């Protein structure tokens, strides 16, 4: 039996990278019947939130939700997770750059330490854990296909 999870993610920030900035991440799990369940997470004030930190936080949230779901299952099915994001940065981090950065000691091609290393390493660790129990795929989608997660981020930031 195959258990399939589809999770739409988004992150947003107001005041990107400046003192007083606020940020939020959202993950929306879409079920086979078309219904969805959603979660949001406000970003901490330090380090100052950025759009990129919010997008990677959303990926971490999705990976955490997938691992929690797997732990709740009574059986050990083949577990296939697809994480959708409208962030080319987040998708690039998880599908390409993360492997190069890890090999280079978390430095980029210019020899500088990569930005958001803490969150990217956290996402990498969660991805590794999920790979032990199933498959995870990251898919870029256009912004207009991600309206629910985007709205949830904005609502979270409105409440901060």
Give the positions of each predicted feature:
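Short, conserved alpha-helix that lines the donor NDP-sugar binding/gating region
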Residues: 55, 59
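RNase H-like nuclease fold core
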Residues: 1-53, 64-71, 156-159
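RNase H catalytic domain
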Residues: 16, 61-153
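Short secondary-structure junctions and interdomain/linker hinges
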Residues: 130, 159-160
């Amino acid at each position: 039996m195959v258990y399939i999870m589809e999770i739409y993610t988004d992150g947003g920030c107001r005041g990107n990278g400046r003192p007083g900035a606020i940020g939020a991440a959202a993950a929306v799990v879409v079920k086979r019947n078309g219904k969805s369940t959603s979660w949001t997470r406000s970003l901490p004030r330090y380090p100052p939130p950025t759009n990129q930190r919010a997008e990677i936080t959303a990926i971490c949230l999705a990976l955490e939700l997938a691992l929690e779901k797997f732990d709740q299952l009574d059986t050990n099915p083949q577990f296939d997770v697809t994480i959708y994001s409208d962030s080319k940065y987040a998708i690039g981090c998880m599908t390409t750059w993360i492997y190069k950065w890890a090999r280079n000691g978390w430095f980029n091609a210019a020899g500088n330490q990569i930005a958001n290393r803490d969150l990217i390493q956290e996402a990498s660790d969660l991805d590794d854990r999920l790979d032990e129990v199933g498959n995870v795929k990251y898919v870029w989608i256009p912004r207009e296909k991600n309206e629910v997660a985007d709205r949830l981020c904005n609502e979270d930031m409105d409440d901060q």
